[in-house]
């Protein structure tokens, strides 16, 4: 075996067999010692590394991978001890050129770039050859300069895998500098589908240690183009949870080395879509390096760029600027940068089918970038699985991010969503958890038992149903199925509980919380709820229709009865949701008509009723027309006007309900009605008791959960905007059932990357020179070191075209509205309907009034037709007379 394979390099330098990148080779040098940083080290943490080799002097050198038989290269696990168990044991050599020995420090201080890298004699280099210095690294403000960076790369198990040194500037700030997982970032170019990752011999670092690490918790953070603030917010929460578990020294599972059992996976949906500031933040943590990724390997397109690194860099947010904090708790990071934008469900395929199959974790935690888990929330989620062996999935409480001192509550939309989230977590989730089936575990913060997710031997099961949605988007799927898979997390929950011959349940963990930013803009809220409402509606129908699948499970008879009761409850709720818009109008009509009674508001009530009825109809028709033809972003003022109108309608209805009830009670009291007789008054019972019971249950339940503050800060806003949910959000959702998109645009084309072609397992490629590492690292730090200022850029041609189309759509919608409303007004006036009969009553019955108006209208129409026809006839006759005299 070649003694050069497992020799450790100076920090910040590539692990190479000692070949200088200049034209002249090295002088013969001896080895030297690397100062070891503080911390625990065990032979089990020794990590096999795969590194590029400089191309000069490659003659006569056999690649490290070629020292083994093909069986070793393809199946190293079968020869584990011989292949991996070679712990790091540096020796001090007698080097006449080496610097004076220095005491150990927290990190390796690589100030002298002239020291030799290895402690063996290179058989290919003569001792008389001179030694040449490397070029000096460029200054921080200069572009990355490429020295002689063409290097020989060796395929690992037939795949391109590179272990790249992290920048010395970063390494010098970190302890444990002697260990490969801290000194090197591992890059793998995946050229396959996620489902083929394991079969294509790809692996992950946790399986390459001399003692492979067991992954108890596998956390995925999915992101699209979130900025560095949102990403840092999530990572801060995740890191705090890992620190919390490392402090649980009395735990049988966790303790000071708990971080070795946790892997944090970040999956970014598209290389062209990732936010540059977020990418720079990942580089600052040591997880990402520019210039490493490849476009193709041997003609095969790279589908995902996988970076692995154990970071010791934490972060904090001050004044909207992310600041890095070195020497923090180690965290095993896995960053998957997908080449193309393929939606969130594809990101989960990489997580479950590719990485999950390699690591075989116990619990998988799903978090959206921007969601900040509480300091011990992930632990509490894990604890739910530990206490209940049959728990297949769990979720925590999703909280709306309210800002410092609750400043975001000033926005009524945020306050409304805060109240909505709170009541869902106080009433809905606990009820479903009591039955054992939660209709949806929110993808923003939830966890699953990996074993429960697996398909059966025929390839059928929860994951198969979950990932079926990826093939349906843009395919030949029916509209029902396509909309159903907008809420594929609901399908996953249903499939878990109904899994054949199993009895898995789902639980709600209130002590686990996750803060997420909610839409603060009406346009964003409409688009979000379109996806939620359509997905949940069609997924609920799917669950109800396929309820019989519960009987294929292994649940007890009592549990199945409980599921039946829960589904009856959900069916009733869905029926009410379907008829919500009609029920709201009927309540409006009954209350406004009642106010027109002579004992109440009389004529004033009648006039107000007619005005509001006409405004109601016009607003609702406007919403339908806009929903079917306009983008919310193209008509923001009209949508905001509708929200204001529905809030006014709600205030009027509340006034009507209270006023009618009070007058009715006063009348009964004057007749000597006792207090007990009040509950026999049908009007009082219908209006007052139902309203008080609803709001009373909200208050009592909130107090029982020790979480009542939303009743004070957000209840009024929620009540005022509740008609908007029925008459705007529902209307827009149902009018856009044809839209099965997630609201993302098509792919931007990313920059072209270099390719690698190999022969006999070896090839050449361009890689960043070590002299550029610090300069590149400094540049990445500068990207997010200042508060983000949105650049003022001229709109693109596509944006201008979209704006023009919004204008055209707006004009079109206004023309249609005027046309519809004027025709409706004509019919209402002629037939004396839509409340006009109450404003201008005439003698005689209603039928006689209608007949009289219709007769007059028909006379006007018929005489008008006759006059117009006569006018045309006169014109035709005049034409004939003129033609007779002109002869043409």
UniProtKB/Swiss-Prot annotation:
Pfam short name (any one): Chitin_synth_1N
GO cellular component: cell periphery; cell septum; chitosome; plasma membrane
Protein name as annotated: Chitin synthase 3
GO molecular function, a single term: chitin synthase activity
Region (Disordered), start-end ranges: 1-41, 91-110, 121-144, 751-771
Organism whose genome encodes this protein: Neurospora crassa (strain ATCC 24698 / 74-OR23-1A / CBS 708.71 / DSM 1257 / FGSC 987)
Entry's EC annotation: 2.4.1.16
Localization per Swiss-Prot or TrEMBL: Cell membrane
Highest taxon of the lineage: Eukaryota
Residues passing through the membrane, by range: 532-551, 572-594, 607-629, 642-664, 684-706, 814-836, 860-882
Protein family: Belongs to the chitin synthase family.
Keywords associated with the record: Cell membrane, Cell wall biogenesis/degradation, Glycosyltransferase, Membrane, Transferase, Transmembrane, Transmembrane helix
CDD domains the UniProt entry points to: Chitin_synth_C (cd04190)
Membrane topology designation: Multi-pass membrane protein
The protein's role, per its UniProt record: Polymerizes chitin, a structural polymer of the cell wall and septum, by transferring the sugar moiety of UDP-GlcNAc to the non-reducing end of the growing chitin polymer.
Gene: chs-3
Catalyzed reactions: [(1->4)-N-acetyl-beta-D-glucosaminyl](n) + UDP-N-acetyl-alpha-D-glucosamine = [(1->4)-N-acetyl-beta-D-glucosaminyl](n+1) + UDP + H(+)
InterPro entries: Chitin_synth, Chitin_synth_fun, Chitin_synth_N
GO biological process, one term: septum digestion after cytokinesis
């Amino acid at each position: 075996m070649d003694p050069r394979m497992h020799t450790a390099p100076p920090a910040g330098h590539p692990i190479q067999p000692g070949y200088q990148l200049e034209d002249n080779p090295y002088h013969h040098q001896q080895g030297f010692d690397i100062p070891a940083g503080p911390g625990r080290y065990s032979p089990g943490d020794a990590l096999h590394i795969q590194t590029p080799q400089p191309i000069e002097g490659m003659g006569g050198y056999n690649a490290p991978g070629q020292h083994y038989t093909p069986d070793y290269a393809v199946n190293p696990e079968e020869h584990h001890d011989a292949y991996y168990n070679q712990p790091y044991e540096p020796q001090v050599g007698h080097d006449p050129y080496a610097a004076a020995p220095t005491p150990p420090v927290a990190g390796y201080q690589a100030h002298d770039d002239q020291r030799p890298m290895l402690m063996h004699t290179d058989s290919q280099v003569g001792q008389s050859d001179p030694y040449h210095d490397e070029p000096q690294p460029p200054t921080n403000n200069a572009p990355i300069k490429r020295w002689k960076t063409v290097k020989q790369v060796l395929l690992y198990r037939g795949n391109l895998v590179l272990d790249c040194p992290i920048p010395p500037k970063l390494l010098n700030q970190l302890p444990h500098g002697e260990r490969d997982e801290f000194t090197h970032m591992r890059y793998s170019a995946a050229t396959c589908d996620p489902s083929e990752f394991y079969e294509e011999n790809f692996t992950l670092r946790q399986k390459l240690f001399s003692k492979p690490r067991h992954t108890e918790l596998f956390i995925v953070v999915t992101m699209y183009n979130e900025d560095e603030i949102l990403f840092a917010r999530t990572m801060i929460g995740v890191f705090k949870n890992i620190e919390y578990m490392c402090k649980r020294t009395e735990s049988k599972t966790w303790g000071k080395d708990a971080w070795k059992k946790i892997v944090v996976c970040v999956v970014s949906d598209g290389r062209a879509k990732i936010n540059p500031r977020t990418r720079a933040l990942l580089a600052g943590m040591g997880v990402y390096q520019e210039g490493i990724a490849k476009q193709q390997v041997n003609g095969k397109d790279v589908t995902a760029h996988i970076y692995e690194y154990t970071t010791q860099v934490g972060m904090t947010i001050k004044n909207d600027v992310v600041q890095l904090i070195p020497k923090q708790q180690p965290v095993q990071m896995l960053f998957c940068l997908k080449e193309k934008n393929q939606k969130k469900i594809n990101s989960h395929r990489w997580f479950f089918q590719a990485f999950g199959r390699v690591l075989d974790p116990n619990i998988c935690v799903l978090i959206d970038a921007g969601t900040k888990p509480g300091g011990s929330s992930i632990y509490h989620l894990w604890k739910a699985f530990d206490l209940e062996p049959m728990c297949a999935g769990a979720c925590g409480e999703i909280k709306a991010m309210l800002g410092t001192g609750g400043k975001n509550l000033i926005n009524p939309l945020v306050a409304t969503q805060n109240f909505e989230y709170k009541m869902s977590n106080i009433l809905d989730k606990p009820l479903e958890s009591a039955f054992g089936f939660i209709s949806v575990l929110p993808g923003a913060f939830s966890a699953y038992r990996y074993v429960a997710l697996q398909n059966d031997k025929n390839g059928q099961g929860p994951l198969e149903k979950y990932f079926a949605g990826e093939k349906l988007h843009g395919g030949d799927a029916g509209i029902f199925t396509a909309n159903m898979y907008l809420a594929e997390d609901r399908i996953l929950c249903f499939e878990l509980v109904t899994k054949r011959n199993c009895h898995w349940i789902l639980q709600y963990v209130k002590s686990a919380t996750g803060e997420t930013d909610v839409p603060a803009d009406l346009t964003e809220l409409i688009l979000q709820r379109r996806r939620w409402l359509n997905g949940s509606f069609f997924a609920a129908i799917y669950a109800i229709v396929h309820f019989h699948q519960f009987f294929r499970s292994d649940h007890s008879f009592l549990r199945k009865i409980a599921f039946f009761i829960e589904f009856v409850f959900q069916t009733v709720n869905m029926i009410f949701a379907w008829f919500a818009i009609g029920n709201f109008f009927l309540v409006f009509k009954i209350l406004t008509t009642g106010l027109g009674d002579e004992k109440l508001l009389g004529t004033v009530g009648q006039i107000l009723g007619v005005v509001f009825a006409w405004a109601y109809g016009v607003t609702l028709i406007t919403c339908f027309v806009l929903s079917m033809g306009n983008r919310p972003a193209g008509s923001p003022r009209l949508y905001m006007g509708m929200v204001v109108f529905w809030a006014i309608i709600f205030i009027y209805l509340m006034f009507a309900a209270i006023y009618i009830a009070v007058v009715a009670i006063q009348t009964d009291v004057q007749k000597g009605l006792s207090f007990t007789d009040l509950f026999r008054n049908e009007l009082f019972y219908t209006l007052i008791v139902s309203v008080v019971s609803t709001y009373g249950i909200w208050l009592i339940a909130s107090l029982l959960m020790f979480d009542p503050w939303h009743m004070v800060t957000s209840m009024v806003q929620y009540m005022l905007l509740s008609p908007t949910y029925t008459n705007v959000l529902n209307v827009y959702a149902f009018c856009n059932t044809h839209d099965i998109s997630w609201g993302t645009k098509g792919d931007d084309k990313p920059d072209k990357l270099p390719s690698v072609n190999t022969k006999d397992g070896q090839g050449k490629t361009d890689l960043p020179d070590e002299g550029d590492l610090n300069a590149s690292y400094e540049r990445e730090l500068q990207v997010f070191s200042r508060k983000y200022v949105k650049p003022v850029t001229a709109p693109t041609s596509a944006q201008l075209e979209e704006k023009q189309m919004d204008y055209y759509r707006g004009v079109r919608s206004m023309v249609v509205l005027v046309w519809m409303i004027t025709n409706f007004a004509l019919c209402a006036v002629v037939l004396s309907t839509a409340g006009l009969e109450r404003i201008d009553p005439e003698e005689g019955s209603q039928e006689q009034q209608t007949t009289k108006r219709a007769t007059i209208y028909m006379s006007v129409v018929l005489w008008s037709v006759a006059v117009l026809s006569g006018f045309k006839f006169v014109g035709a006759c005049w034409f004939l007379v003129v033609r007779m005299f002109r002869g043409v």
